[in-house]
């Protein structure tokens, strides 16, 4: 029997390069395999490592990064967000793709401009109010690192060290992954672990959606203890669990175990606990009993006392869950919009006004108060995103035509502050007619007040970023946003200002707006007390493009040049 020797792949490859004219089986396949690049797997040192739960630093956005959408006229960032308000990268890519299409095709702009495309400049996706993250199962192939972290934490629940068990139970609650093996491990340690670990395991089980009678009884026991800090943590975890539970439709909700025993305990805490614990207990009871008069009265009292953040919690429950749209609630919303120091709370107040609607506001006799406050917030709000949200609310409440009439009339006010407020308001309300646009251009040339001039330039730049008609009109106009020097020199009109002689003097402040070519955003870097060195000696004439226009008497200048020439001749 003949023995056929198998061909080694290395011999085939070697013969293929040495004798390419030879024919042998699978020559094409071997050639393709030999020419293909070799991708070696990453070593254990090159593999990216990630730890769950991650450090809080990785959730924070730095204002210098492009995703934070910095305000394009001030050094301070436009938006600071928390970890749950992170910008969706996919939405940003879709928006940029749509904007490129808009710039390339003017006809497409005219068709879509009246719809959602005009809102792409808004950075409000960072401020969108999202419900709390619900617990969910996790597939091993979906996120291998997180799956590995879950396995490690569940093993840590069996550790002989109490601190490791406590940390593992706490971390599993932060991850919000309700896989079967996680729930079983938590239930096991809740029955057999130390008292401290039992407390945290039951709290994590509630957060992950397990609200059976055993968990509720353990939570009731913790709520009855005298430790105020532990009671507050239990109430916070219970509120998070009930918030996720109430977000599910009624036909798909699971029954809360021993609900009849939990309700009296919460009612007692509302009456006898501290203000913060009483509020948390009222919020928990509000999810269980949305029609409770006791909870409604207590939350209405909270609107008039306590911190602004606590008042906002009460407002969310009253407006979104209990659907109470009374006059005190509307006034509390306006108070949050006017004086809250939290950016997200001011933004959410505008959304609450949309939810209530104009009819309810008119029925409570608060239409004039609401109109005046919204009009004020279109110019005195420091953050552009909130001003744009206010403008959207004005349009939703059908108050925009009246407000536009007042703002446009205010442009001719002799008071510079009033004119500046009107200009800033138009930046978010929009320019609705060519007459108003040309009026703004005339004001830009005739305005002597530097702050008003700067606001005019910013408004035109902002409107050009969303309106192709305005962008086309400003095509060959350079808008220089100048910092007013602290001198007594009278500011010159824009048309007589010298253009910067050096390209280094132009500072593009916002790269995204710089993409709106040929619209340029410039800022002169002229410091007080700093003299510029002339580009040409006094005896030489400047090129035509560098000559400034005549802005004053010219005879003294000629005499000065003749005097310099005479001194040089000596």
Curated annotation (Swiss-Prot):
It comes from the Eukaryota. Coiled coil: none annotated. Disulfide bonds: none annotated. One of its GO terms (biological process) is response to cytokine. InterPro entries: ARM-like (IPR011989), ARM-type_fold (IPR016024), HEATR9 (IPR052873). PANTHER family: PROTEIN HEATR9 (PTHR38323:SF1). This is Protein HEATR9. The lineage of its organism: Eukaryota, Metazoa, Chordata, Craniata, Vertebrata. The gene is HEATR9.
